[in-house]
Structures are given as C-alpha cells and as structure tokens.
C-alpha cells in the first residue's frame, strides 16, 4: 500500500498540471478551483519530500482494464445498458469535483438517462486527503437510507467541507436520519470495502483520481479503456461512440 501511495503522489504531481491545462482550455478555472489545484500540488510536493521523491516509473501506463463482476456496486442507469463507466473517486479531490459539476451532468443526460450507459461508483481515497475515507464510508452508509447518490453528489461538490459535522449537516438537508448515519460512519463497517476498491484500483493500474473504465458491458462487468483525470465530456462521448459500433 505504501508503494501505491508514493507512486500515486508522483503520478498525481505529473497529471494535475495537465488536467488543469485541459480545464483552462475548456473555458477557464474559477479562482477557487485554481486555489484548490495549487493547494493539491503543494500537499503532494510536501509528502513527496517527506517520503523521498521516487524515481519516475519506467513502465508504460496501462490503457485497458477489465472487471468481471460489478454486482453490489452502487449504480446509476439500466443494468442492461450496453455500455459501462466505472469511476474510482476521491471525494476530497478537486478534479473529481470538476468532473461531477461538468462532464458528468452531460454524460448523465446523453447516456445514463437514455439507457445507453450504466455508471458505477467505486472509491479510491488517497492517504494525503484526511477526510476522503470518511466521506467514502459516509456515502455507503447513506445507501442504507437509499440516499447514496444524493449524499455523494453533495459531498462531491464540496471537497473542502468533509469533516463529520459538515457531512451530518448535508445529511440533515437531505432529510436523512443523522443519528443512524453518524453511528454507521463511526462503526467503520464499510472501511474494508473501501480498501478493497483501492486494491482493485492498484491492480488495474489506476494512478490518480478520478480514474475511469469506459467500455462495453460484459455481463455484470466491463471491458474497456482506462482513463485518468477530469476529462471533458467530448472525450467520454468519443469513446462511448467508438464502443457503440
């Protein structure tokens, strides 16, 4: 796990500026988003300095990924949709936030709501985001009250407000039983499941957040391309059209 964290730090340090430039090219970053990106880079640099900067990975990054069984994973859309997107997310990641307030809404309208794509949510909380694990467990706990996607959306839009009190406040606004939610989060009952997602992300070659598998539905699984970063809708649209042929 430590090796994964160190490698992820290096990969994120390389990927963040590229995604930031892509975001700027799409219409510019807000001042707040720019500040979040700078803060992310500073945190990564500080952790790399403490752990010792790793050598740049020499192996070529994987471009394909396959998961055979997504049974039990939180899903939006029709289970019979011909195409699948799996996201590995970190609720404290500013680029995950950017994806969900931009490209995701377009994907949902064009593909998920029309029955063409089923969208699965998995977790990849990074160690240098202290509130990310709590948020991942909170979303799963919200699922017990049939509010997984609602709480996920609110937390994803507020990556800097993921301490326990803010999460409970979000839950209250969503008319959830906040005592039940707090008890569930405190129990750590979903921690092992979140960590299983992280190990799976390592196995397929994910090296930053958000990471996606975009491809054909194969039974209860997916076989497709590995995509890293908050890419624009146009990129997802092109890949989905390619897999629709």
Can you annotate each of these PLM segments?
Residues 21-127, 195, 240-245:
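Extracytoplasmic thiol/disulfide redox context detector
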Residues 24-30, 34-35, 169-245:
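C-terminal cap of thioredoxin/glutaredoxin-like
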Residues 91-172, 177:
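Structural alpha/beta surface segment adjacent to cysteine/selenocysteine redox centers
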Residues 32-35, 39-42, 46, 86, ...:
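Solvent-exposed, polar/charged alpha-helical surfaces in well-ordered, non-transmembrane soluble domains
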Residues 76, 162, 227:
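Short clusters of hydrophobic/aromatic residues that line enzyme substrate/ligand-binding pockets
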Residues 1-4:
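Positively charged n-region of N-terminal signal peptides that target proteins for export
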């Amino acid at each position: 796990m430590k090796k994964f964290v160190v490698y992820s730090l290096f990969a994120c340090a390389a990927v963040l500026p590229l995604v930031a430039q892509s975001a700027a090219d799409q219409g510019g970053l807000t001042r707040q988003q720019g500040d979040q990106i700078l803060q992310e880079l500073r945190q990564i640099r500080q952790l790399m300095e403490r752990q010792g900067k790793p050598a740049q990975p020499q192996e070529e990054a994987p471009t394909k990924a396959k998961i055979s069984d997504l049974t039990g994973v939180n899903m939006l859309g029709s289970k019979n949709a011909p195409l699948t997107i799996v996201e590995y997310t970190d609720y404290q990641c500013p680029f995950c936030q950017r994806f969900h307030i931009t490209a995701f809404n377009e994907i949902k309208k064009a593909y998920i709501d029309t029955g063409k794509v089923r969208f699965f949510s998995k977790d990849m909380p990074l160690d240098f985001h202290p509130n990310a694990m709590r948020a991942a467990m909170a979303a799963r706990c919200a699922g017990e009250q049939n509010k997984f996607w609602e709480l996920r959306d609110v937390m994803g839009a507020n990556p800097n407000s993921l301490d326990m009190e803010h999460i409970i406040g979000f839950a209250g606004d969503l008319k959830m039983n906040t005592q039940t939610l707090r008890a569930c989060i405190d129990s750590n009952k979903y921690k092992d499941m979140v960590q299983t997602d992280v190990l799976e992300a390592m196995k397929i070659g994910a090296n930053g957040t958000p990471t996606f598998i975009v491809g054909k539905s194969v039974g209860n699984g997916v076989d497709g391309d590995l995509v890293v970063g908050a890419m624009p809708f146009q990129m997802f649209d092109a890949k989905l059209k390619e897999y629709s042929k």
